[in-house]
Every structure is written in C-alpha cells, then in structure tokens.
Regions:
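A generic structural signal for short beta-strands and their flanking turns/coil linkers
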Residues: 9-13, 66-70, 82-86, 96-98, ...
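Catalytic strand-loop segment that frames the active site of acyl-thioester-processing enzymes
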Residues: 2-38
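Generic structural detector for well-ordered beta-strands
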Residues: 12-18, 73, 117-119
Length: 136
C-alpha cells in the first residue's frame, strides 16, 4: 500500500435530510424521545464518508478504509428538507492512521466539526478477524 494523498486534500458529500436521518428515528424504543432534527449519528456517518472518499482513489482492489477514531461536536440543529454537506480535509499521517479535519454545514452555516482518523485495511483480513472474534 502506497498512498500519495497530499496534505490539504479535501472531499465532500451532500445529503438532503429526510425522515430516516432524524434523531427521532434513531431509536426503535417508544420510550426514547429524540427531536425531529438531523441526528448526530448521521452527521458522523456523513463525515466518515467524506474522509473515505478522499482516500478511495488510492486504495487497491482488496483494500478499504475504516474509521478508527472520531471526536466531534454537533453544534446546531438542522430540520428535515435541508441539505447538509460534510467535508474532510487531510491533515497528515500518524503512523498508519490518516488524520482528517471534518466539518458539516447546512444553509445556516457550520453544524459540527472535529477530528477523524482512518486506517487502510485488507478487506478479507478484516472480515476474517471479525468472524473469528465473534465465533462461539
């Protein structure tokens, strides 16, 4: 694996917030009460996707990138029907990890930001390890 990702490379992904993206849709338990606004979990997933897209052109066919660390703040609510854009900017490497600054924004401005780290792994090895770890 030789990845020639340049510092400050960016990638973005957009999402129109719909019902399944809302915090109120996250839990399946009726006693859990969450507001009908863009869920933090969906924001994190969008940020991860942006970072993964920055790495994807450099991966071999048997590789993918996986998130191993994320630290974010979700600072503003977004209602359904609004477009959210998540962005990732490559900061550099820390040993085998690829470090990204991530942020998300809607029409009103920034809604969240943080740091995300990804590792590049062999798909077969990852799946075999996951299966082995959960074997009874």
């Amino acid at each position: 694996m030789t990845i020639e990702l340049e510092v400050n490379t960016t990638a973005s992904v957009e999402l129109l917030v719909e019902g399944q993206d809302l915090a109120s849709s996250i839990s399946r338990e009726s006693e859990d009460k969450f507001p009908p606004v863009f869920a933090t979990a969906r924001m994190v997933a969008l940020m991860e996707t942006a970072a993964a897209r920055a790495l994807s052109p450099f991966l071999e066919s048997n590789e993918l990138s996986v998130g191993v660390f994320i630290q974010v703040s979700h600072t503003a609510a977004t209602p359904p029907g609004i477009k959210v854009t998540a962005n990732a900017r490559y900061l550099g490497r820390e040993d085998k990890l690829f470090i990204f600054e991530v942020w998300a924004e809607d029409l009103g401005g920034e809604i969240g930001c943080g740091i995300h780290k990804r590792a590049v792994v062999n798909v077969d090895r990852l799946l075999a390890g996951a299966t082995r770890r959960n074997a009874s």
